[in-house]
Amino acid sequence: QLHQNDWFVRHARRILQERGFEQTTATPLEKILLSHPDATRRLRALWALHAINGLSAPLAEKALSDQDESVRGWTITLLCEHGDPTPSLITKIHQLAQNDPSALVRRRIASAAQRLSPTTRVPVVSSLARKTEDATDPNIPLLTWYAAEGAIAADPMRALDVLSANAFAPL
């Protein structure tokens, strides 16, 4: 995952995925993800770990604290790919929805929230809907609405509270 030619990297990732999870493969990838100075190499390690089902909850929690917004955003996308991640990761994602300075990360959260269970997504959507700095973003308000829309049937009163307190134009 450190080769300069991306073709070799993608080919190696595919081979690793075909082989499946092996701790001897995951350990060097974890080291790259947590400590490599180049964000693109950390992303490649993240993708490879995900491909071999080696992205554990503790490792993902560390990746959600990465200094690079792309690593944080991709971690969110990969974690929510198949539904709800662990409760501790949901808490971390909710904290990022409230406090992350990056619009890219908040956009990834809004997009991923659509794949969360309705009860899990409401607090996340509520935090996103209150971000005044995203009101003029061309994507975040719509993605937030799409995520909220799926939760309305589960808890109409809570959804109404969230939507009435949003910082965006009327959703």
Regions found by a protein language model. Name each.
Residues 1-171:
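Long, ordered, helix-rich scaffold segments
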